[in-house]
Amino acid sequence: MGISILSFDSCDKGPSQEEIDQELIEAYILENNLNTTKTESGLHYIIYDECDDNHPDYYSFIIARYKGYLLDGTVFDDGSQELNVQLAQMIPGWIEGLQLIGEGGEMLLIIPSNLGYGGIAKAKIPEYSVLVFELKLLQVYDKK
């Protein structure tokens, strides 16, 4: 009696979500003539004004004003209100990006889906969306 072993090779699964996001981001950067810096995590950013040395850390509380939109220009948050929150409560792309600027600083973040909401859809944000934020860090403080 012979034993037969079946092997299924699933080498060709297509591009990963990370690869798809990076292709979309690179096309967006090229189309909009942007000069971004890319971190190891895949976050792209432009610092317009680093400002002072009071940079937030993971546990800092921040007050920020921002506009958030998708790569196709769909605005999901118009920045009409200030955000007052502990940085640790934000998406990973914000946590990483905002630590690069100080109080009063301004930047652009282009966040791949794994550093945003991933496979979770939000009100105006489809699942696996690359997010773009124009941010101004108004204040950094520690809540006591």
What name fits each language-model region?
Residues 1-7:
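Bacterial N-terminal signal peptides
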Residues 7-144:
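Cross-family detector of peptidyl-prolyl cis-trans isomerase
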